[in-house]
């Protein structure tokens, strides 16, 4: 959790990042103690349905401060709890049975600085873009017996002084999304994936099986353009890393591969 608090501190000027509640309603506020920020320009946080836990803490904090625009799935995963892992082998003395596994015990729940939990609800994106998980139940809310959503008192924080013109940003973004054929194709693919997951048809004759397999292959080809989409995003390593590339070819290869993956976002 400390890592995500430090990360948020790069973009906000001192203040609470997340609240943690334990048994007995004890509340602890995790704060960025450092004055000043490393970057004060426009900021976007990309999320999807699998963004969970620490990534939700970061997205929620920057959203509450009005510091960033959250873009991605309708909501993130919705994991707002903290677990401790207790190895059973450390508890039972003279154990001759080998590894006994471990217990994972939920001990805490974390909350946004505005007071609401990310449990179940996750973080709602400001700008929603479909992806392959859009019509698949993958969140905490879709699990058996999840802890409920609740809220506590808001922490004392000061919103970002350079407030974003959300109305203008959302309007222009929506217009671009509606005109983007790739977004429409992505939504179509997401619906198709969901339909295939729900289809439990079992073909008992070889001819029907082969025909269905060929149909699926042809249908999937219609979405190949998505893998070739050029985001036109450019990435470069920080100067101190670039100076290391001449001596560390492995580091350079890792960064090149990472930048290539980032460009697909």
Question: Where are the language model's segments positioned?
Answer:
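Conserved acidic, small-residue-rich alpha-beta core segments centered on
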Residues: 1-152
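Conserved functional hotspot residues or short segments at active or partner-binding sites
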Residues: 112-265
């Amino acid at each position: 959790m400390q890592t995500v608090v430090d990360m948020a501190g790069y973009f906000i000027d001192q203040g609470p990042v997340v609240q943690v509640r334990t048994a007995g309603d004890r509340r602890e506020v995790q704060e960025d103690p450092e004055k000043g920020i490393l970057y004060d320009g426009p900021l976007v946080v990309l999320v999807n349905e699998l963004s969970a836990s620490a990534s939700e803490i970061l997205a929620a904090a920057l959203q509450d401060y009005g510091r960033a625009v959250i873009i991605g799935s309708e909501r993130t995963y919705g994991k707002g709890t903290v677990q401790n892992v207790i190895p059973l082998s450390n508890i039972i003395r003279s154990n001759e049975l080998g590894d006994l596994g471990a217990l994972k015990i939920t001990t805490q729940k974390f909350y946004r600085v505005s007071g609401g939990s990310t449990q179940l609800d996750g973080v709602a994106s400001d700008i929603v873009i479909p992806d392959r998980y859009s019509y698949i139940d993958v969140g905490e809310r879709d699990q058996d017996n999840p802890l409920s959503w609740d809220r506590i008192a808001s922490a004392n924080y000061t919103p970002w002084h350079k407030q974003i013109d959300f109305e203008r940003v959302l309007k222009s973004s929506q217009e671009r999304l509606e005109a983007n054929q790739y977004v429409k194709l992505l939504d179509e693919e997401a619906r198709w994936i969901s339909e295939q997951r729900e289809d439990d048809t079992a073909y008992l004759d070889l001819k029907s099986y082969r025909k269905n397999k060929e149909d699926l292959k042809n249908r999937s080809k219609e979405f190949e353009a998505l893998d070739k989409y050029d985001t036109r995003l450019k990435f470069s390593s920080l100067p101190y890393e670039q100076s290391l590339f001449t001596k560390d070819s492995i580091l350079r290869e890792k960064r090149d591969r990472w930048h290539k993956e980032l460009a697909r976002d």
